[in-house]
From Swiss-Prot:
UniProtKB keywords: Aminoacyl-tRNA synthetase, ATP-binding, Cytoplasm, Ligase, Nucleotide-binding, Protein biosynthesis
UniProt superkingdom: Bacteria
Positions annotated to bind L-aspartate: E173, R219, H450, R491
Protein's UniProt keywords contain Protein biosynthesis: yes
Subunit structure: Homodimer.
Name used for this protein in its record: Aspartate--tRNA(Asp/Asn) ligase
Biological classification of the source: Bacteria, Pseudomonadati, Pseudomonadota, Gammaproteobacteria, Legionellales
UniProt entry tagged with the keyword GTP-binding: no
Length: 590
């Protein structure tokens, strides 16, 4: 029906007759002429309807916003002073010789141009209207282009795109599984995959030494901000590799994507920091390196002070005291400090002690703080030295269990940087390496920090069992501007080590055989050295397009309560469907 998209209409087509199809974005009457902004997937074109073309003009008079039309006409240069430099077609317009009304539209539930005034739930309910916004359409197009380029990049390097099952077996991977009842096997269930982890390892055992997949994953977890129950991963695995092989390949790919789509050069190589460095310096294993603020540890200075708020965590093996220096922060008001105190409380902090450095040359006389009277002068002097405090700074203190201090001061670091716009540079990628293999809350059960198939830097299974807290993994995460966009590891390919890891996690051989015996069996038939990585594609596209949420780069996202306003899913089903599956709905137990 059409000859061109809007973005292809420019001065090279002057005096040519073309046909466009799309929606009436806006209709305007001006001095006897009717102007129509026609919108399609690629942009806008101005159409001019002259009363001398009586049939065309009559149709144009009847048009309303979002009517679907086909326009045929000749491309003309716009009159002087009417050029629109903001769109590709801005130098020209179409003099309509024919307009066909293809379909009408009901009055809109909201004006597409005024989406800011509409709740997200309403926009998602009428998502087909929300998707007509040019900026939303552009993000989805960018997503398509990025995926296409990723496929090309990997195809050229010998990777095979291999699909893995969507209906699989429930395994303990951290979050809850979405379960699918089997009609043909009453009382038994499939699970939707949280990741293709086990299948891609089995593919390596089978000899497919370079695999990738753009794959949907499903996790029935309590939704935090900007999470989705179903999401898309770039998943890949390689055989006969070490960490550096995977990291170098992925760096090359990310640099290529940023250069191709954003014209942004990223560093070569990406910097690397250890997990321990990240936690101690930034309070998180996902540091935003654009943020110049850092945490300074002062736990050792507080072991002998009389101030219990500091002394107790300093002498607790699981405690920590750290300081966050904010340059020129002494001018913060009492209200601002109270707001930040309330903010860190979200992360479990019981308060937010501070020292304002009003004049560094006057010793303690140049300081202002309610806690000064509790600290010896030599301790205060050392704090100022370690933090490199200057006149006009403020020092914020965190004192509690290390986890609370890290999370609260890490979040405060991000908040201060955002509030005061302290960012240095636009793009700061970093590899985080040397993660602990296991983690636990004080004296709780050990859990795998990544997953139980991650290879360890320790090669002796007995040492792993004896001292699990000392063992580092061969895992690596790639973080960009404070967001983890990818994570992976070298995998265990030795059955003895795999059983040792499972034992630390409290999983017996019998339980392991029942849950993922298919992988354990495969490891015994010549498993090569292997490793891989998975990228959160939604997150990567959101970052590259400047979207504020991953929901903005997903065509039909769920809400934060895991619901779809468009389809009203999830929903009840007919009793007969449940009976066919041998299911009965009981009262929900939280």
């Amino acid at each position: 029906m059409r000859t061109h998209y809007a973005d292809k209409v420019d001065s090279s087509l002057i005096d040519q007759t073309i046909t466009l199809c799309g929606w009436v974005h806006r209709r305007r009457d001006h001095g006897g002429l009717i102007f129509i902004d026609l919108r399609d997937r690629e942009g806008l074109v101005q159409v001019v309807c002259n009363p001398t073309e009586s049939t065309v003009f009559k149709v144009a008079e009847s048009l309303r916003n979002e009517y679907v039309i086909k326009v045929t006409g000749k491309v003309h240069k716009r009159p002087e002073g009417t050029v629109n430099p903001h769109i590709p077609s801005g130098e020209v317009e179409i003099a309509a010789s024919d307009i066909t009304l293809l379909n009408k539209s009901k009055p809109l539930p909201f004006n597409i141009d005024e989406y800011q005034e509409v709740s997200e739930e309403v926009r998602l309910k009428f998502r087909y209207l929300d998707l007509r916004r040019p900026e939303v359409a552009q993000r989805l197009k960018m997503r398509s282009y990025i995926i296409r380029e990723i496929r090309r990049f990997l195809d050229e390097r010998g990777f095979l795109d291999i699909e893995t099952p969507m209906l699989t077996k429930s395994t303990p991977e951290g979050a809850r599984d979405y379960l699918v009842p089997s009609r043909t096997h009453p009382g038994q269930f499939f699970a939707l995959p949280q990741s293709p982890q086990i299948f891609k390892e089995i593919l390596m055992v089978a000899g497919f030494d370079r695999y990738y997949q753009i794959v949907r994953c499903f996790r029935d977890e309590d939704l935090r901000a900007d999470r989705q129950p179903e999401f898309t991963q770039l998943d890949l695995e390689m055989s006969f590799v070490e960490e550096k092989d995977i990291q170098q390949l992925m760096e090359t790919m990310i640099r290529h994507l940023f250069s191709t789509f954003l014209n942004v050069p990223l560093p070569d190589p990406f910097p690397r920091i250890t997990y321990d460095e990240a936690i101690k310096t930034y309070g998180t294993d996902r540091p935003d390196l654009r943020n110049p603020l850092t945490l300074v540890d002062v736990t050792d200075l507080m072991k002998s002070v009389e101030f219990k708020v500091f002394k107790e965590p300093a002498n607790n093996p699981h405690g920590r005291i750290a300081v966050l220096r904010l340059p020129k922060g002494a001018e913060l008001s009492r209200k601002a400090i109270d707001d930040y105190t309330q903010f860190v409380g979200i992360y479990g902090a019981k308060g937010l002690a501070y020292i304002k450095v009003e004049n560094i040359d006057n010793g303690t006389g140049g300081l202002h703080s309610p806690i000064l009277k509790f600290l010896p002068e030599n301790v205060i002097a050392e704090i100022l030295k370690r933090t490199q405090a200057q006149s006009g700074d403020i020092l914020f203190f965190g004192a509690d269990k290390a986890k609370i201090v890290n999370e609260s001061l890490g979040a405060l670091r991000d908040r201060l940087c955002a509030d005061l716009n302290l960012y240095e540079g636009q793009w700061k990628p970093v590899w985080v390496v040397d993660f602990p293999m296991f983690d636990r809350e004080d004296v709780g059960d050990w859990q795998a920090l990544h997953h139980p198939f991650t290879a360890l830097q320790e090669t002796d299974p007995e040492k792993v069992i004896a001292n699990p807290g000392d063992v580092l993994s061969r895992a690596y995460d790639i973080v960009l501007n404070g967001s983890e966009i990818g994570g992976g590891s070298i995998r265990i390919n030795d059955i003895g080590m795999q059983y040792a890891v499972l034992k630390v996690l409290g999983i017996s051989k019998e339980m392991a055989e029942a849950q993922f015996g298919h992988l354990l069996m495969a490891l015994q038939f010549g498993s090569p050295p292997l490793g891989g990585i998975a990228f959160g594609l939604d997150r990567l596209v959101a970052i590259m397009t400047g979207a504020s949420s991953i929901r903005d780069v997903i065509a039909f996202p769920k809400t934060q309560t895991a619901q779809c306003p468009l389809t009203n899913a999830p929903a009840q089903v007919e009793t007969l469907q449940l009976e066919t599956l041998g299911l009965k709905v009981s009262k929900h137990r939280k």
